[in-house]
Amino acid sequence: MESGLKIVIVNGAPGSGKTSFEELCQDKMGDYCQMRSTVDLVKEIALIYANWDGKKDLKSRKFLSDLKDLLSQFNDVPFRDIVRFKDVWEDELDMYNVKEHPHILFVDSREPEEIMRFKRELGAITVLIRRSDAEMAKTSNHADANVLNCEYDYEIDNNGSLDDLSAKADEFLNLIFDKN
């Protein structure tokens, strides 16, 4: 059975609207949309073992970025977590005989090398969410600083209203699933 899965790597400066865009798409697709970040497992480890308070200030962003780098270098943990998450979800969809139904996995990833690896190994589509004021903000780590140092398949301008972003989410879903 052919899979209807689209893996979409989403990137953008902190505060650019990545999660808002993904949630708008999820509102339209329901259970056929999942979201995972390459730092989700890193955050779980930081919460449980490093007593991280869950705040996303500059110091915490640097800590999480460094921890992700260590886990990536040690055993490719963040990438393998995304692959495992995708495989488990696809198995669930297959169990209900809906694997061929259009479905989307949004993956938040910042590092250009990792983004290109998702494209190469998983056939992912890449999206950059752009918001002018977010791109001018100070960054505390290499991942946030290198957001614009990558070529993306699609760019979504998020300098308008939430309704504007919702319309762009509709357009994007129609485009990637070839709906006219």
What is each PLM-predicted segment?
Residues 18:
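Conserved lysine of the Walker
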Residues 37-103:
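ATP-dependent small-molecule kinase phosphotransfer cores
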